[in-house]
Regions:
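Phosphate-group recognition and catalysis centered on beta-loop-alpha active-site segments
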Residues: 2-10, 17-276
Length: 276
């Protein structure tokens, strides 16, 4: 793995900056960190599975990225409903099951649902956290739900509080993220950091607006160079998403971000190594 660029599986923020790998000087063409998006998405590995995260770690991912949603409350051990790693609200695209994840018990998902690619089980947030900690990786976790109950907020906060986590949200999910921040503010020993996600739709948020959430921002790779410069000048750590191929990698690296979010860390590493 090259010194200048390492692969992350999500974003690390100011509160845990000292505990995370950092780019050499944030000046060179390839000095960005790389975030492994949902673990990995390849022709043989499905996103959000344990296989995808193991693949990311084998290819030197620095941060493990995932999205969290809640399964149905029921007879499972967790009375609030298990927190499942899933980008989609439904099981349709990734697995052989269908319907909203929130309508399924975790026990049923575990027994019945397998990914269309690779035939793997989905995993819970607690499974990802346990694995990541065992291999020394921090996390970037996105809240997808625009509304969560107070019980769900407490459940999520207790789950991630002992780990190096950057919690992220787009504009619609900020109310959910802010519930976590409120709980977190009362803990003097917290390790959680926070980041806003933006695709630039409706305009790029100002530095001041973004800093209301945290000192990091996840921005779509379509971000204009002028906006990128203003974010960096304003003290924001910019993570660009999502790199799917070599053309994307080159564009993202040219903007000299703090980190890049990529679907296939192995492919990104091969491209990066070929630049020398």
């Amino acid at each position: 793995m090259r010194t200048g660029v390492r692969a992350l599986t999500t974003v690390a923020a100011a509160a845990i900056a000292l505990a995370l790998p950092t780019p050499a000087a944030q000046a060179g063409y390839l000095d960005e960190l790389a975030v492994a998006h949902r673990g990995a998405t390849t022709s043989t590995i499905a996103e959000g599975t344990m296989a995808s995260y193991r693949y990311a770690v084998r290819h030197h991912a620095d941060i493990l990225d995932g999205d969290v949603r809640w399964a149905k409350d029921g007879a499972d051990a967790d009375s609030v409903g298990a927190m499942v790693i899933s980008h989609d609200a439904t099981l349709n695209r990734v697995t052989n099951c269908s319907g909203y994840l929130s309508n399924w018990l975790w026990s049923s998902i575990y027994k019945k649902c397998r990914t269309e690619v690779g035939g793997q089980r989905l995993i819970r947030l607690v499974d990802l956290l346990k694995y990541g900690k065992s291999v020394g990786k921090p996390f970037a976790i996105e809240i997808k739900a625009s509304y969560i109950t107070n019980a769900q907020a407490r459940q999520l906060w207790y789950a991630i509080n002992g780990y190096k986590v950057q919690l992220e949200a787009g504009y619609s999910a900020l109310p959910s993220l802010n519930k976590i921040k409120k709980l977190d503010a009362a803990d003097p020993n917290h390790k959680i950091s926070y980041a806003r996600i933006t695709s630039g739709g409706g305009g790029w948020p100002s530095v001041a607006t973004l800093k209301k959430t945290g000192t990091s921002v996840h921005a779509n790779k379509s971000i204009p160079a002028s906006v990128m410069r203003s974010y960096k000048a304003g003290g924001l750590k910019v993570y660009l998403f999502t790199g799917k191929n070599e053309t994307d990698y080159a564009r993202m690296a040219a903007l000299r971000p703090y980190a890049v979010v990529v679907d296939d860390v192995g492919r990104f590493q091969r491209w990066r190594d070929a630049q020398s």
